[in-house]
Each structure stands twice: as C-alpha cells, then as structure tokens.
C-alpha cells in the first residue's frame, strides 16, 4: 500500500539548509551539531529546538558584528599594515621572551629534593601536577575558541605564540616531575592529575566548563581565562618563590620566574582584549567570575593542598590571592572588592603584571636580542666620539 505522506524534505528544510550554508564561520562555531543541513528534523519538538537555536544564533551574530575584534576580517591572513599597535606590541613582548625547557639547569635540584621533608616534596609534586595539566587546558581554549573567534590579525599572532609558550610550560613541568619523581606509578598518578586528584579536577572542570559554554560571550570567557592565568596560578607561583627565598631548588625556581613572567603577560593581554570590547560584561558579572575563582584557589591552597606543608601561613596566602584578584579587577577597569595589602614582601617585584619592571629586567637574559628594539636602533654609523 503506497503512502500518501509528503516527503520530509519540505520547503522549510530547504530554507534551513540555505541558511546553514550562508552562515559565517563564527556562527557555525556556535551552532549545535544537530543543526547540520544533512540532518532531518523529524518532529515538532526538533523544529521547536531549531527555532529557539536560530533565534539565539541571530542574537549572537548581531553581537559579533558589533565587536571589531570578532567581526569577519578578509584581511586577517596578512599582518601589515598594523591596525592595533597596542596588541602588536604585546605580541612583540611575547616574542622577545621566548625560551625553551632545555635552557633550565636542573643539575642541582635533585640534591635539594632529597633533603626536603616528605610534606614539602608532597606539596611541590602536586603543584607541578596541577601546572602540567593546566597549561594544556589553556591551550584547549585558545585552539577551540579564541583563535577561531578573534579576527584581528595582531591578536591571532599573540594567541599563536601563546600556544607555543604554553606547550613549553607544560613540557617544563612534565620534565620537572620526570626529574624529581623516580617511582613510575607516582609519576603516572601526577601526570594524570585531572583524573586522579579531586583538588586539581575541581580547578580543571571550572576552566573546561567555560570552554564548553556556548552561551557565554567572548568577553565573559576572556575574564574567566584571565582568572585562570592570573588567580589560579598566582598562589602556586608564590609558593615556589617562597622556596627560592629559602635558597632551595634553583632549577625549579628559575623556571618558575620565566613561566610566571609569561603568564603575567598572557593575563595582561586578556585585559587588553577586554578593553577593546565594545559590549563588555557588566561589573557584577565580572566580579562574580573573579570572586568564584578566588574561592576555588583559596580552597586549593589552604585546604586541599595547604601551603603550611612548606611552612607558609594559610591566612596570608588567602590574603595574597585576594590581593591578586583586586589587582586584576583594576586592570580590567573595575573597583577592588577585597581591598587588602600584599602580605608577601618577596612577591613585590614578581607580580603577575607583565607590564612591571619584572619583564624589563630580562630575567636570566631571556629576552631575545633586538626583538624589542626599533628599526633605528640597528643602524651603523661612523660618527662615534673617541
């Protein structure tokens, strides 16, 4: 018996297919897989879902078109002429600070490692495990979201270089774990920290949720990842600098200087991108994101992995994290929340502000020669006075 039903491929579906084909790359990035033009919408429920998603897509498209950073740019494949000089300068700073894991001398660290107390070794190994995993998460966000959304060439240059540096950071932390930890089972436990350590998993999940949130706008996610690099890393950086103050682990502490400088620059760049946004998240939204990150970091370093294990004061560490959060809020253009002083004098010149003199000091001479100099600095003359 032949059916009298009309085919499912109706005029409505053809319209859907046409709309899908005409969508820009940015729209497709935010489009659920179920809206593929090859997928048949076989029920009223599915059609309703599509209509709602289409409305959200149009709203997002309007927001994208209003943002110069996200607006489709046909000139994005060529760098010159420079349009955003402040963003380009950030890229050149990142380029000038390039280094590799092979340049860090770990030969003296093993002797120090063996002389540490058990609780000190426990703390350091767990902090390194968090760091080794977190840089990969930052890269996941850059590859999956930011580099696909941002259309400004200068910013794409920075993100591309940041990806390379995050890989070097992750390699460095993995190398440190490989050097210090001789037991293969313990090494495997540390390398898989996101699955094996609940305290690390909580921080990782927070960041991963922001990557996967298709409804969160770019501005909110920029703030979230500024918090990851500016707050989630800050307490752990401070704990390793505390070891430096005690004259311990020279290889670990030197690599920590290099990495904290890099992360400071990455955090500054996030704040710069935020300032370029036309439609910024509200102050309430920004402060909610920052304060949530502060709570998680305070719990991490005073409860889950307390800094008292290495002789630091937990209350002062809480205060330091609040101080760092206030500084980040100021850089984003908002008022402080916590209004506390920096309790760690040894962190005064090692802040997470890439624009401080910490960067200009060329730590360990790791600023590439000539990269930050102007073209006139490279001229040859014979008019020197003798």
UniProtKB/Swiss-Prot annotation:
Q: Which GO molecular function entries does the Swiss-Prot or TrEMBL record give?
A: metal ion binding; ribonucleoside-diphosphate reductase activity, thioredoxin disulfide as acceptor
- State the organism of origin: Danio rerio (Zebrafish)
| Entry GO terms, CC | cytosol
Catalytic activity, reaction form: a 2'-deoxyribonucleoside 5'-diphosphate + [thioredoxin]-disulfide + H2O = a ribonucleoside 5'-diphosphate + [thioredoxin]-dithiol
InterPro entries (alphabetical): Ferritin-like_SF, RNR-like, RNR_small, RNR_small_AS, RNR_small_fam
| Superkingdom of origin | Eukaryota
Please give the function described in this protein's UniProt entry.
Provides the precursors necessary for DNA synthesis. Catalyzes the biosynthesis of deoxyribonucleotides from the corresponding ribonucleotides.
- Sorted alphabetically, which Pfam families does this protein's record hold? Ribonuc_red_sm
Supply the name of the protein.
Answer: Ribonucleoside-diphosphate reductase subunit M2
Supply the alphabetized keyword list. Cytoplasm, Deoxyribonucleotide synthesis, Iron, Metal-binding, Oxidoreductase, Phosphoprotein
Give the sites modified to Phosphothreonine: 31
Oligomeric and partner information: Heterodimer of a large and a small subunit.
Instruction: Give the Polar residues compositional bias ranges.
Output: 1-24
Q: What is its EC number?
A: 1.17.4.1
Q: Which GO terms describe its biological process?
A: deoxyribonucleotide biosynthetic process
Question: Where can this protein be found?
Answer: Cytoplasm
What binding details are noted for the cofactor? Binds 2 iron ions per subunit.
Per the record, residues carrying Phosphoserine are: 6
Which cofactor is essential here?
Fe cation
Catalytic residues?
A: 173
Q: Tell me its family.
A: Belongs to the ribonucleoside diphosphate reductase small chain family.
Name the segments for region: Disordered.
Answer: 1-36
């Amino acid at each position: 018996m032949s059916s009298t039903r009309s085919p499912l491929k109706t005029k409505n579906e053809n319209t859907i297919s046409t709309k899908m084909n005409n969508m820009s790359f940015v729209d497709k990035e935010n489009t659920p897989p179920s809206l593929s033009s090859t997928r048949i919408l076989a029920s009223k429920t599915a059609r309703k879902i599509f209509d709602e998603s289409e409305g959200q897509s149009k709203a997002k498209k309007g927001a994208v078109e209003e943002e110069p950073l996200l607006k489709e740019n046909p000139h994005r494949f060529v760098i010159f002429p420079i349009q955003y000089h402040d963003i380009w300068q950030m890229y050149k700073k990142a380029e000038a600070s390039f280094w590799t894991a092979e340049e860090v001398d770990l030969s003296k660290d093993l002797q120090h490692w063996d002389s540490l107390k058990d609780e000190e070794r426990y703390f350091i190994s767990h902090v390194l495990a968090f760091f080794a995993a977190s840089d990969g998460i930052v890269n996941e966000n850059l590859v999956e979201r930011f580099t696909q959304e941002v259309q400004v060439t200068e910013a794409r240059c920075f993100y591309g270089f940041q990806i390379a540096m995050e890989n070097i950071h992750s390699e460095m932390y993995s190398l440190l774990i490989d050097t210090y930890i001789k037991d293969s089972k313990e090494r495997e436990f540390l390398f898989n920290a996101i699955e094996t350590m609940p305290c690390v998993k909580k921080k990782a999940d927070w960041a991963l949720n922001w990557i996967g949130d298709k409804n969160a706008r770019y501005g909110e996610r920029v703030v979230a990842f500024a918090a990851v690099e500016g707050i989630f890393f800050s307490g752990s950086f401070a704990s390793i600098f505390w070891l430096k103050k005690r004259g311990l682990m020279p290889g670990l502490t030197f690599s920590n200087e290099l990495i904290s400088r890099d992360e400071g620059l990455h955090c500054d760049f996030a704040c710069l991108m935020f300032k370029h946004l036309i439609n910024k998240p509200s102050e309430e939204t920004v402060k909610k994101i920052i304060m949530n990150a502060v709570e998680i970091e305070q719990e991490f370093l005073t409860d889950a992995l307390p800094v008292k294990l290495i002789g630091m004061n937990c209350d002062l560490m809480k205060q330091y994290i609040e101080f760092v959060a206030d500084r980040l809020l100021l850089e984003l253009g908002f008022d402080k929340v916590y209004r506390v002083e920096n309790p760690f004098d040894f962190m005064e010149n090692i802040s997470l502000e890439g624009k401080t003199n910490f960067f200009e000091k060329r730590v360990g001479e790791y600023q590439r020669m000539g990269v930050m100099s102007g073209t006139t600095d490279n001229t040859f003359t014979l008019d020197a006075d003798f």
